[in-house]
Amino acid sequence: MTVQTFTPNQTTTLETAKKTIAEQSQNSQTTGNKIGFVSLGCPKNLVDSERILTQLRTEGYEIVNSYHDSDVVIVNTCGFIDSAVQESLDTIGEALKENGKVIVTGCLGAREDEIRQVHPNVLGITGPHAYQNVLEHVHQYAPKPAHNPFTSLVPDHGVKLTPKHYAYLKISEGCNHRCTFCIIPSMRGDLVSRPVGEIIGEAERLKNAGVKELLVISQDTSAYGVDTKHSLGFANGSPVRHNIKALSEELGKMGIWVRLHYVYPYPHVDEIIPLMAEGKVLPYLDIPFQHASPRVLKMMKRPGQAERTLERIKKWREICPELVIRSTFIVGFPGETEEDFQILLDWLKEAQLDRVGCFKYSPVEGAAANEIEDQIPEDVKQDRFERFMLVQQEISAAKLQKRIGSTMQVLIDEVDDEGAIGRTYADAPEIDGLVYLNGETNLKPGELVNVVIEHADEYDLWGSVLHDAQ
């Protein structure tokens, strides 16, 4: 059984909601009622979709790739920003028009009244990570088929919506923070960490299935284990603490790429950097700083010591010179002055971050930031966004120019009749840069190759494979 994903063109400047249609290979035998599935939003939502699909396949349902062939369509929604809400509502409407039998889940599902007001005819609505409730709705409108263990086989690692060579590994659910621009805690609740043994077991199954890269995700990755008071757990019979350092050490033993995402800038993040220097996890840190002005950070309810953060970044790079830092920022936050924005630009120039995404602030229903006075006009937001990205573009271009002439390991993502496309340790899938290998048509997705970097632009690299070195 194979799973393919379909995503729209991605950019490195804005992480918008992404639509994923689940498609099972056509040589799978029909084993029961047919389910269509649309997944919207972030990688954390994608993992929820994978879990639902895995359970459906385990129960004998067939997953199909068209509205017309589906007995029921499930839409896993995103509700983080207004544009994501609109995309979710539009997708629900499309599914109702094309099929008529729709079950809604995901973050927007936590706002049932809003969905019912626009689409009163949906069959059922559940909130995020309400897997059992989704299945109950499916059972009601598409009863369980007769289960045949010989035609309903599901791989040990479950159904995945990513390419075979990388997978998202979700380590916790929810968040204890109350950032004023965010409503995730109201939809997904407070932090709940997965047992460490369960996480390691899933990671091992993924590795055994051919996964070469694990992307560790959650709402707040560095808070892993806080809710358990960092209690002692067990993985493969050995004691392991429920904290991000111990978990990273265990994942690092597997001999595949381990990439940490959504790391909140707690002081104990400093403890992870030596693991990166030792090669146990990738020297890549996705850490959303959001802003640099102390005044704006205070309004956001984010850590406000920007100068201290610069000192930490300097120390991290001294410990691990190869460290790549990715971050996201919000411009046009309510009350942001030109002086605040200039502080951000100056900080960005000083920090010299490798990869950066930027959002123009968008009001989110229920967010505390909506009550802040001095909402910023859209034209000012756009101007600041463009100025911000111009500064970062220059930083990124200069950093990538320094890669020319070096040899880097590249993980191949795609191959066609023109060549191959891959990524270095410095680039996460879909949100960062790419490495183009023109003419390399004999490579395979998931293959690791050594590449001499020959050319660079603002975000991407071009190079040639060192075949003798393989």
From Swiss-Prot:
Main location, first listed in the record: cytoplasm
Signal peptide: none
GO-annotated cellular components: cytosol
Positions in coiled-coil regions: none
Residues annotated as domain TRAM: 401-467
Bilayer-spanning residue ranges: none
InterPro entries: Elp3/MiaA/NifB-like_rSAM, Methylthiotransferase, Methylthiotransferase_CS, Methylthiotransferase_N, Methylthiotransferase_N_sf, NA-bd_OB-fold, Ribosomal_uS12_MeSTrfase_RimO, rSAM
Source superkingdom: Bacteria
Reaction it catalyzes: L-aspartate(89)-[ribosomal protein uS12]-hydrogen + (sulfur carrier)-SH + AH2 + 2 S-adenosyl-L-methionine = 3-methylsulfanyl-L-aspartate(89)-[ribosomal protein uS12]-hydrogen + (sulfur carrier)-H + 5'-deoxyadenosine + L-methionine + A + S-adenosyl-L-homocysteine + 2 H(+)
Keywords, comma-separated and alphabetical: 4Fe-4S, Cytoplasm, Iron, Iron-sulfur, Metal-binding, S-adenosyl-L-methionine, Transferase
EC number: 2.8.4.4
Cofactor (UniProt): [4Fe-4S] cluster
Function: Catalyzes the methylthiolation of an aspartic acid residue of ribosomal protein uS12.
Database matches in NCBIfam families: 30S ribosomal protein S12 methylthiotransferase RimO, MiaB/RimO family radical SAM methylthiotransferase
The protein's name in its UniProt record: Ribosomal protein uS12 methylthiotransferase RimO
Protein source organism: Vibrio cholerae serotype O1 (strain ATCC 39541 / Classical Ogawa 395 / O395)
GN (gene name): rimO
